[in-house]
Amino acid sequence: STTAPQSLLLLNSGFSLTMAKSLAGLCQAGAAPAGESVRRMYRLLFQREPSREEMRLARQFVAGPSSGDVEPLAQLALALINLNEFLFVD
């Protein structure tokens, strides 16, 4: 986002978290390795494959411990839906 209040609203809203959890569930359904869930998420959100660096960082993040009641894949989804690449069309 381009403004701090907008970014904070998107990151902290219940709607964004609900959508992130739904996206994580959709990407996890039927995906064997964690990497496939990440690839699905990128395809759905950005219509492209993740770069090697994006894939490495995402796998590292998803493999880490969860914080609170939100699983790491849902946290990743929340972060990705708040990227400018998702919010704005070039």
PLM regions: where:
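Amphipathic alpha-helical segments that form the core helices of the histone-fold
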Residues: 56-66
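Surface-exposed patches in mature extracellular/periplasmic domains of secreted proteins
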Residues: 53, 69-75
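An acidic, gly/pro-interrupted, aromatic-rich
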Residues: 1-45, 49, 75, 80-90
